[in-house]
């Protein structure tokens, strides 16, 4: 009997679905700003950024398929049932009301409303009003899921991508400066690869891939593929197609960002940079189109995230707190957070991402190599414990200086700097994870087979 697999056309459809899930307007602000910071070192910056903003997210989706899991909670549950619940909650809150949803509102405001205000001195008030209207729409459609998100996805997203392509081509044909002539900022002068690797965390796509991988699997199943191995293969191949498109967009965005330094000073954030570039090359009309399309794209993303988070928490709590209640709670919290502003949200998210990404990357890696140790729980535990401990030091290091002083973190940070290789590159968790894996494998191989399978 022949195992059904996706056709090329179907793989392209799945790749398009995955691209729509991953790539929102917020993803554009990081590569453009990265290009401005990296300058002539744009190529190593591209490589580092693509690894964490494309490679790991694609493999995160594939990890759900390869392990035949029915979602993130099942995959993380290979460590323990409690860990599966904890990690699922943490990831959904991060890509939901803590950072990603509020960021959607502030990206829309920064690219759409803020440029028209000038130095009014009342930007906080306009942000408050804008975010109130934005989240009123988000809540309305989250409580009444219907064709609005499909309409935005089928019409607004293609318009946005076409507009973005026109903008990038215009910028490439008339660059403000050659990227090779742009001086990098201090952090990117001697080593652009490692800072860019960490910059890719900001997209949050690796943890989003873990959270939404099951959605892609369901799409493939609805296309008639039922064999688990075939599903895993189709997830990976479709993901690679998505990754190629995302990588192309990131490469162009980073290059245009670097070239824009010939026209503008280093911007406060990527939203400001994108608005400046659109205004320079396409005028006021270009800025307006950018603002409208990004706002609708961010609206769609926010509705999807509120819906996904509310459904997940409704399921995990057994309906004790209704979907409607979760949707209202997450929307209200996102509204409150959005009013700290885009730059603040990005800055506040860094320590949390430094804490979450290492165990997420470790989980994805273990999912891929798990067949070599039968997905023995002891190996997962042996890797996760040192990874979390080491990631905690990265979390401490990236906290604001005032928080470090208040919490008396100088001593533990200095300890980590002296004892963890690559700590200065924000990868101090890597060696502990490898050592933990080695210990776990030794433990696994020394145990009776029936114990390892337990």
Regions found by a protein language model. Give the residues of each.
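Hydrophobic, small-residue-rich membrane helices and short re-entrant helix-turn-helix hairpins
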Residues: 144-155, 193-196, 216-245, 263-275, ...
């Amino acid at each position: 009997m022949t195992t059904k697999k996706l056709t090329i056309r179907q793989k392209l459809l799945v790749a398009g679905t995955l691209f729509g899930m991953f790539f929102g307007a917020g993803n554009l602000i990081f590569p453009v700003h990265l290009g401005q910071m990296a300058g002539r070192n744009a190529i190593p910056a591209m490589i580092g950024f693509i690894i964490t903003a494309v490679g790991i997210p694609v493999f995160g989706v594939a990890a759900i398929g390869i392990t035949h899991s029915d979602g993130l909670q099942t995959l993380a549950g290979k460590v323990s049932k409690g860990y599966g619940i904890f990690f699922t909650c943490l990831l959904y809150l991060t890509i939901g009301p803590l950072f990603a949803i509020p960021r959607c509102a502030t990206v829309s405001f920064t690219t759409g409303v803020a440029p028209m205000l000038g130095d009014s001195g009342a930007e906080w008030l306009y942000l408050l009003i804008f975010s109130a209207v934005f989240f009123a729409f988000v809540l309305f459609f989250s409580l009444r899921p219907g064709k609005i998100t499909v309409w935005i996805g089928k019409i607004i997203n293609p318009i946005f991508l076409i507009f973005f392509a026109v903008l990038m081509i215009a910028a490439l044909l008339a660059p403000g400066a050659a990227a090779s002539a742009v001086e990098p900022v201090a952090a990117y002068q001697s080593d652009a690869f490692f800072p860019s690797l960490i910059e890719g965390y900001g997209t949050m796509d690796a943890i989003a891939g873990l959270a939404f991988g099951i959605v892609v699997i369901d799409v493939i199943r609805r296309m008639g593929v039922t064999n688990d191995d075939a599903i895993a293969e189709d997830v990976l191949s479709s993901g690679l197609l998505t990754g190629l498109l995302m990588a192309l967009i990131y490469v162009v965005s980073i290059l245009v960002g670097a070239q824009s330094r010939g026209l503008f000073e280093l911007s406060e954030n990527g939203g400001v940079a994108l608005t400046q570039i659109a205004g320079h090359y396409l005028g006021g009309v270009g800025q307006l189109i950018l603002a409208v399309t990004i706002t609708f794209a961010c609206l769609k993303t926010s509705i999807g995230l509120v819906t996904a988070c509310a459904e997940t928490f409704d399921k995990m709590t057994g309906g004790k707190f209704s979907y409607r209640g979760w949707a209202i709670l997450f929307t209200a919290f996102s509204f409150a957070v959005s009013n700290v502003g885009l730059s603040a949200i990005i800055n506040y998210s860094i320590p949390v991402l430094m804490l979450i990404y290492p165990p997420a990357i470790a989980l994805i890696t273990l999912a891929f190599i798990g067949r070599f140790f039968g997905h023995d729980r002891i190996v997962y535990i042996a890797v996760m414990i040192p990874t979390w401990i080491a990631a905690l030091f990265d979390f401490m290091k990236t906290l604001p200086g005032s928080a470090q002083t208040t919490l008396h973190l100088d001593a533990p940070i200095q300890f980590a700097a002296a004892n963890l290789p690559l700590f200065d590159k924000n990868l101090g968790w890597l060696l502990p994870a490898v050592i933990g894996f080695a210990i776990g494998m030794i433990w696994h191989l020394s145990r009776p087979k029936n114990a390892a399978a337990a």
